């Protein structure tokens, strides 16, 4: 079967190629290859010649496959429109196929290629550096059109460079010959094309160094004594020296340029122009090899031989490197006076020009440079065209681009100058007319005005709002009818303009002219009625609906049964009985299924009400017999599927624990679930916070289950108790439990011992804790900066489950390396989770600021904060390891450890947090895998393959966090790979990890062990903390 399909496909492709080669001449308008900027729209036009009595059906192929139309890619008449072109999906060949509905003949156009213009990034690469030459390359990830090539500009310390003296610009390369101290600085490049302009992320810093060759005086047959093997010899260069490079001698003084080009000339586009270069050539040099050259922007433009000598071989060092040396009839270089004349100036002639005399064996003689500025004529590029807009489309654009000198201002008006643009229509900075939520009021004539000092030009386009035709009642079949009977085939359509309906039989159009009017009736609503059906009426009937927005077609099969085609009576009766029995069985099974489902629903409802009654009774006992109204009517628990409703404000905080043995149930599972629900509700009531205590809420992004805010919490609502004290208790208790000292008696002894130690704080650590307690007491009256996570997706069970998991994680840990959970706001939807936040915000933004990637300058400070030292990076990593070790000791896993999910304060205290801004701010760092947003570049292989999260997977992510710290978070892990490639390599075990270059050697081995495939071979957080502590101690020594 597969071989048959392949054979049919090859035959169809061969037929299409034959149609392309033989019938392309039948097209009146062929689709043309185009280059378009990414995210802009493009139209492929197609129209074929046809007999006026017949019609054509058009369809489009993309890379040999039929296009599936949607709101972004759709067909307008015979033309194809693509909105917001994407290079990953839309690049390729497009073929228009025209099918005659009368004869069924198909014609295919030659393929039209679509190229997408884009520009992503630029970087400076060092190709070579020595004392004679410095060679840099600007590497750009971009694609440009043939009409608008990629433009490269070089900068040294923010000053733009041009070809001058020892600096040469050669396409993407920068060549500096004989570099000296004057060439020291930071070199960057910018790249621009029709898609935009980018600057290199990191430049190249060049520092010239004194180069001298140390030489020791040595006579013939003289050997150095052995004692000299450890002597130190100094090499001192002469200040201001050239490093031993011999320059060419200066040319004779009587060979000189008398007058060079004007320093600044302004010429209108289309006017003639001439650049002057008067020179003096002595008689004694007439037979010498002398060449007159004109350069534009440092590149050789034209040259001519002077005197009676033979021409110079080649073009010296410029041979083969200057792309401007080409034939152009507009340019003429006059040998007699050195003048460079232009017959008519065009926009590309603008630039810096310089005249040069080159005498063989001598340094060139250069004139002063002159700048030619071209006043470009005001014009539209391209001319705006009319457009059909789809009704209710979320966004539609009409482009209007104008060029001229000075840069023109573009405006849009509707109908006339006195009519403003309608609602939801705006003009962006590039002059593009943007329609949002297209409606019928957007129809009309729109005029684009381009204005500058030259004057004003305008272009008027017609905007029409259309609705793609749709079947309101499509043909349904197959239809079986007896001979001489009547049959009705429905076909009704909606659209704007009102679509026309055309019927055909076996691809032959049907109309009142070619059918029996007494038997065939075409109703006004599009329905086809056939009376006195004949045997020849059997076949495939097609209904085609269409308007200016496109065409659609549906087929239905009509089967006509005659008396001679019937079965014997006994056989027919048997078939009818079988069909009836099958229908009865099917209906019986369906009815039984419905009854079963309804019964289960009623049973589940009864059980749920019984559980709620038991919960309400338990809550009443806990509250001392005062039952809230919400519990009485039983509606509180159904309003919020994630968390139970808060009762009576803060009343839950004063309730005591209930007896766990009360109200036992006969059903063990229900009893356990009731006790778990009671315990969870009791915990959430202990965490209750009033919503009025939150002030100055500012949204900073969106997470996996709702919006994320930063605000302030009143100091009176912040629970007392230092995390550092609880941290010490937690670690000491964990140590005791590991030593086997668990039990009620030992536990009370340990607590009393800890209390005694707290009363007698004499060590340096205890003194520091006392200072922290005093500082916290002083700041207790200040409002607390908090992070607020809203639970918007209350109907999403997966989001609710993740919300509860984060609550349990942060509620169960009290450590100075982990943010505190201040409480929950559950008075109304959405629920708020209130977490501790810091004044410096998340760690990733702090790292980017210290790396100079975030603009932190203000009016008083013009420099970015300095980058972190190795000691500071190790201190940050150590604090994160301590916080993660506390999470491990509490038997929890984080699952999304990264610098973006850590916070840092102005006191350089780092805490593990959980903002998880995966929907907007850090959406690049998440990828949807198996219908879930995952940070795949931070996840261990077992998390991606088996969805298994353990402490060892957190250790894997911690290794990536340390990699981020040493790279200042300036790039993503494996940013050269796409998300799909990262997943494939991780699952195959071929994803290779390397530590950052600035990582200390003592940490390389243990960090590499964090990324091994076997989770059991990865280190623990305590081992990582010990290694980091040793590394910090070694740096301090």
UniProtKB/Swiss-Prot annotation:
Residues recorded as bearing Phosphoserine in the entry: 680
Domain Ig-like C2-type: 25-115, 114-200, 252-366, 369-464, 469-559
Residue ranges that the UniProt entry lists as topological domain Extracellular: 23-582
Presence of the UniProt keyword Transmembrane helix in the record: yes
SUPFAM superfamilies, per the entry: Immunoglobulin, Protein kinase-like (PK-like)
Disulphide bridges, residue numbers: 46-96, 138-189, 277-355, 400-448, 491-543
GO biological process: cell adhesion; cell surface receptor protein tyrosine kinase signaling pathway; imaginal disc-derived female genitalia morphogenesis; imaginal disc-derived male genitalia morphogenesis; internal genitalia morphogenesis; negative regulation of canonical Wnt signaling pathway; photoreceptor cell axon guidance; positive regulation of neuron projection development
Listed Basic and acidic residues bias regions: 724-735
Subunit structure: Interacts with plexA; component of a receptor complex that mediates the repulsive signaling in response to Semaphorin ligands.
Function, as annotated: Acts as a calcium-dependent, homophilic cell adhesion molecule that regulates neural recognition during the development of the nervous system. Component of the repulsive Plexin signaling response to regulate motor axon guidance at the embryonic stage. Also component of a receptor complex that is required in the adult visual system to innervate the lamina layer; specific targeting of R1-R6 axons.
Designated name of the protein: Tyrosine-protein kinase-like otk
Organism: Drosophila ananassae
Gene name tied to this protein: otk
């Amino acid at each position: 079967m597969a071989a048959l399909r392949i054979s049919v496909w090859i035959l169809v492709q061969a037929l299409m190629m034959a149609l392309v080669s033989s019938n392309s001449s039948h097209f009146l308008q062929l689709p043309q290859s185009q280059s378009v900027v990414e995210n802009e729209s493009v139209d492929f036009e197609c129209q074929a010649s046809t007999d006026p009595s017949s019609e054509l059906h058009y369809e489009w192929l993309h890379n040999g496959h039929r296009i599936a139309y949607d709101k972004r890619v759709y067909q307008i008449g015979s033309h194809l429109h693509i909105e917001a072109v994407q290079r990953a999906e839309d690049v390729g060949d497009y073929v228009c196929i025209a099918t005659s509905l009368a004869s069924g003949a198909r014609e295919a156009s030659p393929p039209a290629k679509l190229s997408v213009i884009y520009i992503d990034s630029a970087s400076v690469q060092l190709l070579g550096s020595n004392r004679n030459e410095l060679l840099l390359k600007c590497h750009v990830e971009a694609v440009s059109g043939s009409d608008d090539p990629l433009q490269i500009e070089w900068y040294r310390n923010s000053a733009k460079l041009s070809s001058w003296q020892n600096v040469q610009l050669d396409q993407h390369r920068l060549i500096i010959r004989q570099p000296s101290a004057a060439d020291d600085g930071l070199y960057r490049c910018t790249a621009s094309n029709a898609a935009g302009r980018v600057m290199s992320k990191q430049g190249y810093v060049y520092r010239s160094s004194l180069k001298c060759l140390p030489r020791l005086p040595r006579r013939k047959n003289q050997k150095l004594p052995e004692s000299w093997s450890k002597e130190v010899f100094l090499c001192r260069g002469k200040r201001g020296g050239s490093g031993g490079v011999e320059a060419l001698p200066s040319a004779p003084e009587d060979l000189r340029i008398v007058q060079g080009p004007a320093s600044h000339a302004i010429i209108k586009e289309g006017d003639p122009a001439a650049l002057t270069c008067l020179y003096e050539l002595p008689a004694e040099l007439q037979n010498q090899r002398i060449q007159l050259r004109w350069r534009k922007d440092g590149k050789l433009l034209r040259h001519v031989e002077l005197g009676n000598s033979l021409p110079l071989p080649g073009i010296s060092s410029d041979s083969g490197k200057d792309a401007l040396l080409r034939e152009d009839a507009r340019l003429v270089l006059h040998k007699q006076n050195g003048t460079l004349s232009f017959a008519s100036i065009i926009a590309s002639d603008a630039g810096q020009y310089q005249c040069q005399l080159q005498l063989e064996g001598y340094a060139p003689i250069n004139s002063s440079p002159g700048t030619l500025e071209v006043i470009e004529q005001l014009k539209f590029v391209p001319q705006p065209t009319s457009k059909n807009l789809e009704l209710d489309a979320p966004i539609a654009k009409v482009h209007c681009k104008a060029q001229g000198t000075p840069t023109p201002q573009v405006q849009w008006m509707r109908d006339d100058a006195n009519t403003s643009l309608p609602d939801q229509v705006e003009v962006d900075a590039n002059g593009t007319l943007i329609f949002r939520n297209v409606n019928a009021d957007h129809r009309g004539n729109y005029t684009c005005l381009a204005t500058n000092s030259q004057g004003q030009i305008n272009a008027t386009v017609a905007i029409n709002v259309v609705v793609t035709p749709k079947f309101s009642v499509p043909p349904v079949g197959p239809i079986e009818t007896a001979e001489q009977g009547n049959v009705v085939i429905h076909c009704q359509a909606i659209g704007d303009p009102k679509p026309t309906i055309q019927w055909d039989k076996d691809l032959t159009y049907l109309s009142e002219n070619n059918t029996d009017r007494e038997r065939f009736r075409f109703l006004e609503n599009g329905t086809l009625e056939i009376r006195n059906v004949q045997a020849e009426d059997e076949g495939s009937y097609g209904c085609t609906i269409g308007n200016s927005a496109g065409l659609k077609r549906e087929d239905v099969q009509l089967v006509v049964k005659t008396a001679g085609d019937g079965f014997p009576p006994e056989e027919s009766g048997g078939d009818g009985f079988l069909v009836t029995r099958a229908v009865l069985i099917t209906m019986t099974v369906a009815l039984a299924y419905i009854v079963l489902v309804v019964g289960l629903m009623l049973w589940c409802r009864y059980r749920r009400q019984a559980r709620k009654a038991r919960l309400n009774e338990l809550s009443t006992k806990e509250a001392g017999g005062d039952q809230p109204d919400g519990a009485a009517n039983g509606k509180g628990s159904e309003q919020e599927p994630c968390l139970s409703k808060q009762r009576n404000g803060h009343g839950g905080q004063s309730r005591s624990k209930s007896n766990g043995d009360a109200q036992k149930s006969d059903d063990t599972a229900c009893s356990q679930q009731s006790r778990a629900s009671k315990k969870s509700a009791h915990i959430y009531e202990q965490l209750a916070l009033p919503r009025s205590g939150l002030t100055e809420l500012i949204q900073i992004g969106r997470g996996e289950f709702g919006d994320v805010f930063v605000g302030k919490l009143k100091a009176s609502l912040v629970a007392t108790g230092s995390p550092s004290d609880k941290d010490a208790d937690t670690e000491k208790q964990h140590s005791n439990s590991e030593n086997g000292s668990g039990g009620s008696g030992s536990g009370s002894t340990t607590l009393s011992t800890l209390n005694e130690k707290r009363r007698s704080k004499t060590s340096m650590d205890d003194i520091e804790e006392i200072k922290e307690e005093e500082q916290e007491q002083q700041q207790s009256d200040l409002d607390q900066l908090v992070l607020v996570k809203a639970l918007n997706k209350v109907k999403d069970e997966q989001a609710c489950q993740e919300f509860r998991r984060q609550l349990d994680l942060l509620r169960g840990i009290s450590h100075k390396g982990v943010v505190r959970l201040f409480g929950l706001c559950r008075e109304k939807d959405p629920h708020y989770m209130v977490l501790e936040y810091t004044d410096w915000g998340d760690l990733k933004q702090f790292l980017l600021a210290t790396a100079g990637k975030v603009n932190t300058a203000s009016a008083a400070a013009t420099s970015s904060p300095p980058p972190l030292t190795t000691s500071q990076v190790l201190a940050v990593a150590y604090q994160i390891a301590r916080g993660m070790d506390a999470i491990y000791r509490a038997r929890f896993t984080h699952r999304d450890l990264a610098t973006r999910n850590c916070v840092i304060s102005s006191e350089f205290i780092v805490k593990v947090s959980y903002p998880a801004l995966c929907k907007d701010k850090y959406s690049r760092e998440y990828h949807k895998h198996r219908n879930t947003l995952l940070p795949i570049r931070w996840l261990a292989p077992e998390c991606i393959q088996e969805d298994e999260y353990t402490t060892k997977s957190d250790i894997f992510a911690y290794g990536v966090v340390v990699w981020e710290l040493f790279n200042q978070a300036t790039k993503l892990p494996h940013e050269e790979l796409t998300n799909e490639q990262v997943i494939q390599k991780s699952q195959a075990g071929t994803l290779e990890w390397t530590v950052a270059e600035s990582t200390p050697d003592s940490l390389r081995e243990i960090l590499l062990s964090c990324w091994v495939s076997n989770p059991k071979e990865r280190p623990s957080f305590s081992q990582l903390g010990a290694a980091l502590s040793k590394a910090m101690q070694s740096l301090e020594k």
